[in-house]
C-alpha cells in the first residue's frame, strides 16, 4: 500500500537513508548553489524540504550567508537536523502554508515539490511570502516527464500523490506565479538518465 511522503521519509530518517540522498544529490545541489549565490553579496537562505539539514549546514558555512534556515514536514528529519547542529534554525511545518517571519534572498529545494498535493501552491507561497524583491527560487527534481527512468518511482518507493510533470509545466508554474528571468537546465545527464531538472527564477 502506498503511503504519504512524510511517513516514508520519516522512516528513512530512522534507517539513515537520508545520508544516501545527500550523497546522490550533492552534485546537483552544488550546481544550483554555484548558479544562485552571487560572490560577496550577503544573503539569507531557506532550504524547503531540508531533510536532515545537510544543505543548510553547507550554506551556513559560506562567508556571505548571514542566515540559513531549514523547513521540513517530517518531525524525525528535523529532530535529526537539530541533533547534528543545534545552533542552526530548523522548523517542522507544512511548507504549503508556512511563511518565514522575515523574507529571504534565496530559497532552494531539492527533490521535494513533486511530492506535494499542489506544486503550484508552494511556488505561489514562496513568491508571495518567502522571498524579498529580487530574491531567487531555485529547485531541482529528478522525477519529471522527460526523465523516463524515473516514471516508476511512485510504485517502486510506495509513495502516493507524486506529480509527474513536464519541464514546460514546471516553467509555466513559475511564470504564472510572477517569477521573471525563469530558466531551466539539466545537471548530471548520462545514458538512460536525463539528469536533474533545475528550474530557477527571480521575484
Per-range role (PLM):
Residues 108:
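A conserved beta-strand element that flanks and buttresses the S-adenosyl-L-methionine
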Residues 186-203:
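Core SAM-dependent methyltransferase catalytic element
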Residues 1-38, 145-146:
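Conserved class I S-adenosyl-L-methionine
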Residues 134-142:
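Conserved beta-strand signature within the Rossmann-like core of class I S-adenosyl-L-methionine
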Residues 142-161:
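Short, glycine-/aromatic-enriched active-site segment of Class I SAM-dependent methyltransferases
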Residues 120-133:
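A short glycine-rich, Lys/Arg-flanked "PGG" loop and its adjoining helix->strand segment in the class I
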Residues 46-97:
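Class I SAM-dependent methyltransferase SAM/SAH-binding core
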Residues 162-178:
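Short alpha-helix
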Amino acid at each position: 500500500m502506498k503511503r504519504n511522503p512524510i511517513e516514508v521519509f520519516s522512516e528513512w530518517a530512522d534507517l539513515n537513508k537520508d545520508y544516501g540522498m545527500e550523497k546522490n544529490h550533492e552534485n546537483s545541489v552544488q550546481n544550483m548553489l554555484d548558479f544562485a549565490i552571487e560572490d560577496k553579496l550577503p544573503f539569507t537562505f531557506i532550504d524547503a524540504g531540508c531533510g536532515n539539514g545537510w544543505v543548510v549546514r553547507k550554506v551556513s558555512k559560506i562567508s556571505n550567508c548571514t542566515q540559513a534556515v531549514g523547513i521540513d514536514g517530517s518531525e524525525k528529519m528535523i529532530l535529526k537536523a537539530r541533533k547534528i547542529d543545534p545552533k542552526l534554525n530548523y522548523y517542522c511545518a507544512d511548507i504549503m502554508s508556512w511563511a518565514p517571519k522575515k523574507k529571504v534572498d534565496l530559497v532552494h529545494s531539492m527533490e521535494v515539490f513533486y511530492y506535494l498535493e499542489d506544486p503550484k501552491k508552494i511556488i505561489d507561497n514562496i513568491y508571495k511570502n518567502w522571498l524579498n524583491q529580487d530574491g531567487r527560487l531555485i529547485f531541482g527534481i529528478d522525477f519529471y516527464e522527460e526523465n523516463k527512468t524515473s516514471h516508476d518511482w511512485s510504485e517502486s518507493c510506495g509513495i502516493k500523490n507524486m506529480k509527474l510533470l513536464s519541464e514546460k509545466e514546471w516553467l509555466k508554474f513559475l511564470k504564472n506565479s510572477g517569477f521573471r528571468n525563469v530558466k531551466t537546465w539539466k545537471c548530471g545527464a548520462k545514458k538512460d538518465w536525463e539528469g536533474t531538472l533545475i528550474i530557477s527564477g527571480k521575484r
